[in-house]
Every structure is written in C-alpha cells, then in structure tokens.
C-alpha cells in the first residue's frame, strides 16, 4: 500500500458539520497539521469530500 501525507490548509470554521467530522476522523484538528495515511478506497472518499480544505502529497 502507498502512503500519503494529508495537510489541513484551510480552517474548519464555518464549514458543514459533516466536513468537520471528516477532518477529525482524518486526525486533522488545526490548520497546518499533517497526518500520514495508507491509501484505501474509504480514505479516498473522505479526502474527496474535504478536498477544498486539505492538500495531499505522496509520502
């Protein structure tokens, strides 16, 4: 499995509750925070729903 690094680049203030919960599930709680994840179909769906708030890079 391939690893990726997910970085939160925009604040979650004023976004839908579902998006806040998705960021929390990804382990992102504040702007600039990074987490390393293994790529999976479930993760891809989560990243797609909050793509306007995050940046994704290959690890």
From Swiss-Prot:
Record carries keyword NADP: no
Cysteines joined through disulfide linkages: none
Ranges annotated as spanning the membrane: none
Keywords annotated in UniProt: Ribonucleoprotein, Ribosomal protein
Gene3D superfamilies xrefs: Ribosomal protein L30, ferredoxin-like fold domain
Cellular component aspect of the GO annotation: cytosolic large ribosomal subunit
GO molecular function: structural constituent of ribosome
InterPro entries the UniProt entry points to: Ribo_uL30_ferredoxin-like_sf (IPR036919), Ribosomal_uL30_bac-type (IPR005996), Ribosomal_uL30_CS (IPR018038), Ribosomal_uL30_ferredoxin-like (IPR016082)
Ribosomal protein among keywords: yes
Pfam families listed in its UniProt record: Ribosomal_L30 (PF00327)
PANTHER family hit by this protein: LARGE RIBOSOMAL SUBUNIT PROTEIN UL30M, MITOCHONDRIAL RIBOSOMAL PROTEIN L30
Protein family (similarity comment): Belongs to the universal ribosomal protein uL30 family.
Oligomeric and partner information: Part of the 50S ribosomal subunit.
Record protein name field: Large ribosomal subunit protein uL30
Lineage of the species this protein comes from: Bacteria, Pseudomonadati, Spirochaetota, Spirochaetia, Leptospirales
């Amino acid at each position: 499995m391939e690893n990726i690094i997910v970085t939160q680049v925009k604040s979650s203030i004023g976004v839908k509750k579902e998006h806040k919960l998705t960021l929390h599930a990804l382990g992102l709680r504040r702007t600039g925070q990074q987490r390393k994840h293994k790529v999976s179909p479930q993760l891809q769906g989560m990243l797609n729903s909050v793509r306007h708030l995050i940046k994704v890079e290959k690890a």
